[in-house]
Amino acid sequence: MKEKIAYLGMGIWGFCLASLLANKGYHVVGWARNAELIAQLQTEKRHPQVPDVPIHPNLSFTTDMAEAVENASMIVEGVSSAGIRPVSEQLKTITNLNVPFVITSKGIEQHTGLLLSEIVVEIFGNDASQYLGYLSGPSIAREVLKGCPCSVVISAYNPDTLKKIHNAFLTPTFRVYPNSDLKGVALGGALKNIIAIACGISDGFRFGDNAKSGLVTRGLHEIRKFATIMNCRPDTLNGLAGLGDLCTTCFSSLSRNTKFGKLIAQGMTVAQAKAEIGMVVEGVYTALSAYQIAKHHKIDMPITTGIYRVLYENLDIQEGIAALLQRNTKEEYL
């Protein structure tokens, strides 16, 4: 009998990783609230966002969360950052966490400033920490689905949990590197989306590669400063969860955050750009949370502040660019 894994969330990234696990021989049950999506997956055997990819026979779908998690040896979530609280609350009514719970979403909760792992612990209690894992890194879903080589990191507080998750996801083309700094891994994946929006704006104005590389480098500096204040290891941000994810998100034509930045640079409103993309743009929500936390801790994050002001205070983009370029220069410190 195949080992069962429950996957909560069937967006393109959830479908991608669920397919990877199914290909490894696991019986994967994908869950989503969207009954129309689940019906389409069941009947058409294709995901609407990647219709060229057939559904693996080891992958089935349901709208019943209890059915999805029953007898599962691992639970993986792939919902939006805004969805992890209601999904975790629903899961709590069904079961306590006593198997590895893998977070694959990237973000910071608005208004509370909590990392997604902290939300899960708040709902399930401190004992849940031993089952928590975090998967992050430079990973475009469509490339992973094609079997292109990809390297990510897995982090967990408990060594046994880390080993189980590592072994579940590792394939010849999906390289999984352990990292014990769960908070740093989580922050790297969340904050890079803000910098990606800035890079998209740069693309929209055709500022070129020099400007974009400058944004990526100074953006990484902001992320490292933020993470250090939050008691993360700075070296984590030099690896796959930081620099690696940042580069992919900022330079890939498939990045929704970069696309979003480009669209607003071309004159769309925030609402219009989000509607055009048609998927969650996590950087929009993370910008608010990161700005509020940075302000509270007095962390100087000019790129993040600029993006926040454009998105939430209607700052003219040209004025925001001018403000960045007119800042006093100082000794480069990375």
Swiss-Prot record:
Cellular component, GO annotation: cytosol
Q: Name one GO molecular function term.
A: NAD binding
Instruction: Provide the residue positions that the database annotates as binding NADPH.
Output: 13, 33, 106, 141, 256, 280, 282
Q: Which GO biological process entries does UniProt record here?
A: carbohydrate metabolic process; glycerol-3-phosphate biosynthetic process; glycerol-3-phosphate catabolic process; glycerophospholipid metabolic process; phospholipid biosynthetic process
Keywords from the UniProt entry: Cytoplasm, Lipid biosynthesis, Lipid metabolism, NAD, NADP, Nucleotide-binding, Oxidoreductase, Phospholipid biosynthesis, Phospholipid metabolism
**EC id:** 1.1.1.94
Pathway of this protein? Answer: Membrane lipid metabolism; glycerophospholipid metabolism
Q: Which residues take part in binding sn-glycerol 3-phosphate? A: 106, 137, 139, 192, 245, 255-257
Q: Does the keyword NADP apply?
A: yes
* Pfam families from the UniProt entry: NAD_Gly3P_dh_C, NAD_Gly3P_dh_N
Q: Does the keyword section mention Cytoplasm?
A: yes
Q: Where in or outside the cell?
A: Cytoplasm
What is catalysed by this protein?
sn-glycerol 3-phosphate + NAD(+) = dihydroxyacetone phosphate + NADH + H(+); sn-glycerol 3-phosphate + NADP(+) = dihydroxyacetone phosphate + NADPH + H(+)
For this protein, the record's PROSITE patterns field holds: NAD_G3PDH
Q: Where is the active site?
A: 192 (proton acceptor)
Superkingdom? Bacteria
| Assigned protein family | Belongs to the NAD-dependent glycerol-3-phosphate dehydrogenase family.
Name the PANTHER family for this protein.
Answer: GLYCEROL-3-PHOSPHATE DEHYDROGENASE, GLYCEROL-3-PHOSPHATE DEHYDROGENASE [NAD(+)] 2, CHLOROPLASTIC
**What does the UniProt record say this protein does?**
Catalyzes the reduction of the glycolytic intermediate dihydroxyacetone phosphate (DHAP) to sn-glycerol 3-phosphate (G3P), the key precursor for phospholipid synthesis.
Name recorded for this polypeptide: Glycerol-3-phosphate dehydrogenase [NAD(P)+]
The beginning of the lineage is: Bacteria, Pseudomonadati, Chlamydiota, Chlamydiia, Chlamydiales
